[in-house]
Amino acid sequence: MIGLIVVPILFAIKGIVVGVQKVKKKFGKHSNTKDQKEDKDEDKRQSISQRKQHTEWPIEENRIQRRAPNQSAL
């Protein structure tokens, strides 16, 4: 029961923290700090992994579809 209250609050806090970090990164005094480079690298890694998650199944499905006509010709 407590989890139903605590979990959404934690997600809200995390969202606020991430939002503040993005604003600081965008409007910070130093444009090329080490932290910002690390944040950009992390953002790239996350976006690549998200793209892979969204594209893995259709690619496999296409491979199976491409192989099926060749196998039936044998």
From Swiss-Prot:
Residues 32-46, 53-64 have a biased composition (Basic and acidic residues). This is Uncharacterized protein YNL155C-A. Keywords: Signal. Residues 1-19 form the signal peptide. Residues 26-74 are annotated as: Disordered. It comes from Saccharomyces cerevisiae (strain ATCC 204508 / S288c) (Baker's yeast).
